[in-house]
């Protein structure tokens, strides 16, 4: 039932006292012709409605959330407390810089810390999410070559295992996207060599990649990319695996985008809020979006980079997310962040070892923070697909992994347990998944009709995507 269906004419959740200020009528041209169709409910009905909706949701505060390539780690509540401090909560972006020195200092110091973590020379905090950061990075690439008069570079090379946003971001900026083939789950260096020429503007990579494998030829790839005059772009989706161990800048990357809402522990999902800072090496610093923050003596000021691509978002980005990420980094410290990556990799390898007993691991061996399993054999022998397995997992009160990604693995399950889950939780999750796979052979219909115990049963996802309903009534 929607909040509109609970509406009863005349019910109110809040009443204002009578006002002694004389009434003033607005001109007719500003008035609605009909009253807005807003729900009329009492406060108890309002609270109960949204409380019941919340109880139907799942979050990392309820249990493991192993979506691959999403880094759904537990988010310390201290971060929320910091972001809710009055000095951060009650400011306005139009205030004079003299009155928001604390906020500017936080942004300046956060940039410095992120540059140290990634090996970049400067950074913008404006982008609102990872894909937005990618778009910003591609705009910088385009402007860089335009400024050099090198207008013939129209191609961006992207691995076949890449996130879908990689080719989308490059395409939106006007580049032609060319796919690099994989070999043993990593970039095929020989295929890359054939594709690199004077028309290539950039190569976009994730390292570790979406299969959870570290690109062992990354230094060679960087050298080849730079020799042909192109830039190397780093998708920071999987940075959680390498903090304190290796830096993108030291691998040879020129541009990097991060996902503060993932790696640096701020709640995310359902479209936000996110933050996708973009870091660059020295030769690209002048192309960063404005405004940028700098320190002038004891004051923090805003400035416009000389060759800026312009604004990519209003004001200064999703500022509360910046506060949470800043708090997380200070709380963890350098050793703590390194420990985060160590535990993320350990947990992934432990869980992979449990799961490889009953599911295929196409690219086996040591993984980083995540791994990809395949239910192709299960589907071939039982007719049960990965989607059915994922739906059945819901009946056990936990969230399924990412499914059908990356596209180069048939019937894929992409699993990222993160560093914040303990051994008992990992054991329980493996036990649930094994039980579901066993059930596929013994009672396949139970999976094909799952979930059975959730408030909402299986929906027609194709219909939902093709004919979405955006209104509460037709």
Swiss-Prot record:
The modification N6-(pyridoxal phosphate)lysine is found at residue 262. GO terms for biological process: glycine decarboxylation via glycine cleavage system. One of its GO terms (molecular function) is glycine dehydrogenase (decarboxylating) activity. It comes from the Bacteria. Pfam families: GcvP2_C, GDC-P. Keywords: Oxidoreductase, Pyridoxal phosphate. It catalyses: N(6)-[(R)-lipoyl]-L-lysyl-[glycine-cleavage complex H protein] + glycine + H(+) = N(6)-[(R)-S(8)-aminomethyldihydrolipoyl]-L-lysyl-[glycine-cleavage complex H protein] + CO2. GO terms for cellular component: cytosol; glycine cleavage complex. Its cofactor is pyridoxal 5'-phosphate. Belongs to the GcvP family. C-terminal subunit subfamily. The glycine cleavage system catalyzes the degradation of glycine. The P protein binds the alpha-amino group of glycine through its pyridoxal phosphate cofactor; CO(2) is released and the remaining methylamine moiety is then transferred to the lipoamide cofactor of the H protein. The glycine cleavage system is composed of four proteins: P, T, L and H. In this organism, the P 'protein' is a heterodimer of two subunits. This is Probable glycine dehydrogenase (decarboxylating) subunit 2.
């Amino acid at each position: 039932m929607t909040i509109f269906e609970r509406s009863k004419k005349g019910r109110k959740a809040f009443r204002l006292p009578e006002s002694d200020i004389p009434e003033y009528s607005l001109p007719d041209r500003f008035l609605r012709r009909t009253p807005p169709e807003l729900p009329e409910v009492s406060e108890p009905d309002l609270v109960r409605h949204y409380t019941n909706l919340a109880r139907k949701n799942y979050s990392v505060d309820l249990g493991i959330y192993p979506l691959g390539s999403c880094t759904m780690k537990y988010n310390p509540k201290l971060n929320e407390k910091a972001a809710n401090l009055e000095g951060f909560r009650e400011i306005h972006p139009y205030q004079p810089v003299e009155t928001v020195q604390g906020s500017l200092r936080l942004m300046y110091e956060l940039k410095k810390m992120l540059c140290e973590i990634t090996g970049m020379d400067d950074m913008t905090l404006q982008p609102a999410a990872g894909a937005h950061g990618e778009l910003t990075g591609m705009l910088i690439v385009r402007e860089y070559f335009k400024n050099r008069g090198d207008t013939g570079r129209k191609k961006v090379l992207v691995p076949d295992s890449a996130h879908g946003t990689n080719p989308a971001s490059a395409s939106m900026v006007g580049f032609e996207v060319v796919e690099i083939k994989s070999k043993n789950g990593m970039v095929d260096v020989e295929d890359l060599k054939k594709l690199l020429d004077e028309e290539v503007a950039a190569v976009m990579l994730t390292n570790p990649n979406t299969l959870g494998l570290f690109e062992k030829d990354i230094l060679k790839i960087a050298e080849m990319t730079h020799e042909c005059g192109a830039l190397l772009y780093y998708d920071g989706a999987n940075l959680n695996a390498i903090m304190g161990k290796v830096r993108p800048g030291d691998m040879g990357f020129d541009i990097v985008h991060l996902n503060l809402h993932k790696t640096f522990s701020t709640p995310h999902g359902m479209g936000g809020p996110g933050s996708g800072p973009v870091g660059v090496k020295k030769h690209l610093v002048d192309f960063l979006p404005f405004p940028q923050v700098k320190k002038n003596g004891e004051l923090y000021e805003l400035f416009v980079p000389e060759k800026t691509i312009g604004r990519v978002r209003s004001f200064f980005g999703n500022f509360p997310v910046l506060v949470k990420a800043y708090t997380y980094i200070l709380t963890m410290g350098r050793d703590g962040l390194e420990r985060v990556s160590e535990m993320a990799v350990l947990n992934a390898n432990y869980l992979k070892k449990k799961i490889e007993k009953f599911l295929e691991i196409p690219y086996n061996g040591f993984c980083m923070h995540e791994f990809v399993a395949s239910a192709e054999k299960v589907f071939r022998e039982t007719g049960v697909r990965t989607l059915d397995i994922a739906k059945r997992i819901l009946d056990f009160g936990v969230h399924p992994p990412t499914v059908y990604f990356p596209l180069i693995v048939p019937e894929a399950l992409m699993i990222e347990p993160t560093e914040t889950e303990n051994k008992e939780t990992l054991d329980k999750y493996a036990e649930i998944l094994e039980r579901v796979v066993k059930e596929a052979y013994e009672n396949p219909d139970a999976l094909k009709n799952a979930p059975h115990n959730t408030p909402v049963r299986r929906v027609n996802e194709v219909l939902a995507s093709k004919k979405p309903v955006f209104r509460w009534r037709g």
